[in-house]
């Protein structure tokens, strides 16, 4: 009886033949993945930036009326450092070179998260307008701080540190002059406090805020 030789083992593909080859394949895969991610990021970053610029411009126009300025608000930003609030990005409205308004954002803790508030202020410290940029408050209750849901936020236009007096910058339940919402006092209280902080920021930094913008080079 003739012995039959054992069948030859199938040869492994070259990329499985050794740990080195396997490592090379993994490195190539990682490189291709990184390149694809970079290309995808480049293709989406420009539209995202453009949308962000559009949203910023639209928000600024809501708190500083268009007829008060002849400059590009979004492009006229200067940082202002403050001992209480840190460094704040301030957008400066000008007309014929004179400062006519300022806009900046502050945030404060609401019922269920931070509430971002954009303030527009005249050079004399009077509020031109206020808008809530974002929040996570309770739908149907706290979301009345949105101008799309209620006109409550419009009531701050024309107010200042002198009107009402500082002791009355509170909701009515706390002895102030501003309405709270039925079933939601914490949210309007937080917005009132944030707006008051914004007015105090202006008061502390009025000289720097209302100084003329440097000429464009």
UniProtKB/Swiss-Prot annotation:
It is a single-pass membrane protein. Its cofactor is FMN. InterPro entries: FMN-bd, Ion_transpt_RnfG/RsxG. Signal peptide: none annotated. It holds the Pfam family FMN_bind. Part of a membrane-bound complex that couples electron transfer with translocation of ions across the membrane. Required for nitrogen fixation. Involved in electron transfer to nitrogenase. Its EC number is 7.-.-.-. GO terms for biological process: electron transport chain; nitrogen fixation. The complex is composed of six subunits: RnfA, RnfB, RnfC, RnfD, RnfE and RnfG. This is Ion-translocating oxidoreductase complex subunit G. The chain crosses the membrane at residues 23-43. Keywords: Electron transport, Flavoprotein, FMN, Membrane, Nitrogen fixation, Phosphoprotein, Translocase, Transmembrane, Transmembrane helix, Transport. Its main location: membrane. HAMAP family: RsxG_RnfG. The lineage of its organism: Bacteria, Pseudomonadati, Pseudomonadota, Alphaproteobacteria, Rhodobacterales. GO terms for molecular function: electron transfer activity; FMN binding. The keyword Protein biosynthesis does not apply. It comes from the Bacteria. It is found in: Cellular chromatophore membrane. It comes from Rhodobacter capsulatus. Induction: Expression is reduced under iron-limiting conditions. The gene is rnfG. It is an enzyme of class 7 (translocase). Belongs to the RnfG family. One of its GO terms (cellular component) is plasma membrane-derived chromatophore membrane. The modification FMN phosphoryl threonine is found at residue 185.
């Amino acid at each position: 009886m003739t012995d039959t030789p054992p069948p030859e083992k199938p040869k492994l593909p070259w990329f499985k033949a050794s740990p080195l080859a396997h490592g090379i394949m993994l490195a190539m895969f990682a490189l291709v993945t990184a390149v694809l991610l970079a290309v995808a990021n480049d293709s989406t970053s420009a539209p995202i930036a453009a949308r962000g610029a559009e949203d910023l411009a639209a928000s600024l126009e809501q708190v500083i009326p268009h007829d008060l300025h002849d400059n590009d608000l979004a492009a006229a930003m200067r940082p202002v450092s403050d001992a209480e609030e840190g460094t704040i990005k301030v957008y400066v409205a000008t007309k014929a070179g004179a400062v006519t308004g300022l806009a900046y954002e502050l945030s404060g803790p609401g019922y269920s998260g931070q509430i971002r508030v954009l303030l527009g202020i005249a050079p004399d410290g009077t509020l031109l307008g206020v808008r809530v940029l974002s929040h996570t408050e309770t739908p149907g209750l706290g979301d009345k701080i949105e101008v799309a849901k209620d006109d409550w936020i419009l009531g701050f236009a024309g107010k200042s540190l002198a009107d009402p007096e500082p002791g009355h910058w509170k909701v009515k339940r706390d002895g102030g002059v501003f309405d709270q919402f039925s079933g939601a006092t914490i949210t309007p209280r937080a917005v009132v406090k944030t707006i008051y902080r914004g007015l105090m920021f202006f008061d502390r930094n009025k000289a720097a805020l209302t100084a003329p913008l440097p000429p464009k080079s």
